[in-house]
């Protein structure tokens, strides 16, 4: 059973990346994170949402991105879900510096950033049916 949970859904406009980042940060604030911890979460969410918009929906603004977040004791689990084009090769996509959109001058560091700032990263994707990125982080909660 979770201590708390939330979900939000928004259209795949790049302007909504900031909204997603702040909404998740506000939800996580109940764990009384440090500035560094909250920035880690915001950065990882930003990368995942940006991936959904740029890669999943190929910058189309007619898709939906869903975020589900759940707090269990001292850990937050955040899922970023899209119904975009999916990822052909997850292992390749997770390699540092790999990008499927070199035409957009993308750095190919999104998954690496998520792995660096979070405690766990899971990616599930099916070509033509979208992608689900799950990131987790534990906090030093003082009772």
UniProtKB/Swiss-Prot annotation:
EC number: 2.7.11.1
Catalytic activity field: L-seryl-[protein] + ATP = O-phospho-L-seryl-[protein] + ADP + H(+); L-threonyl-[protein] + ATP = O-phospho-L-threonyl-[protein] + ADP + H(+)
Listed InterPro entries: Anti-sigma-factor_SerPK, Anti-sigma_F, HATPase_C_sf
Keywords: ATP-binding, Kinase, Nucleotide-binding, Serine/threonine-protein kinase, Sporulation, Transferase
GO MF terms held by the record: ATP binding; protein serine kinase activity; protein serine/threonine kinase activity; sigma factor antagonist activity
GO BP terms, alphabetized: asexual sporulation; negative regulation of sporulation resulting in formation of a cellular spore; sporulation resulting in formation of a cellular spore
Top-tier EC class: transferase
HAMAP family: Anti_sigma_F
Family stated for the protein in its record: Belongs to the anti-sigma-factor family.
Its job: Binds to sigma F and blocks its ability to form an RNA polymerase holoenzyme (E-sigma F). Phosphorylates SpoIIAA on a serine residue. This phosphorylation may enable SpoIIAA to act as an anti-anti-sigma factor that counteracts SpoIIAB and thus releases sigma F from inhibition.
NCBIfam families assigned to the protein according to its UniProt record, in alphabetical order: spIIAB
PANTHER family membership: ANTI-SIGMA-F FACTOR RSBW, ANTI-SIGMA-F FACTOR RSBW-RELATED
Descriptive protein name: Anti-sigma F factor
């Amino acid at each position: 059973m979770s201590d708390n949970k939330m979900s939000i859904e928004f259209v795949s406009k790049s302007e909504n990346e900031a909204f997603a980042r702040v909404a998740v940060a506000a939800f996580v604030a109940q764990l009384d994170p440090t500035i560094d911890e909250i920035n880690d979460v915001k950065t990882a969410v930003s990368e995942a949402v940006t991936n959904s918009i740029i890669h999943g929906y190929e910058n189309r603004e007619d898709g939906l991105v869903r975020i589900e977040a759940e707090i269990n004791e001292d850990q937050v689990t955040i899922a970023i879900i899209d119904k975009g084009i999916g990822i052909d090769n997850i292992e390749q996509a997770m390699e540092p510096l790999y990008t499927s959109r070199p035409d957009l001058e993308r750095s190919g560091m999104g998954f690496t950033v998520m792995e660096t700032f979070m405690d766990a990263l899971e990616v599930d994707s099916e070509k033509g049916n979208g992608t689900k990125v799950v990131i987790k982080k534990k906090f030093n909660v003082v009772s």
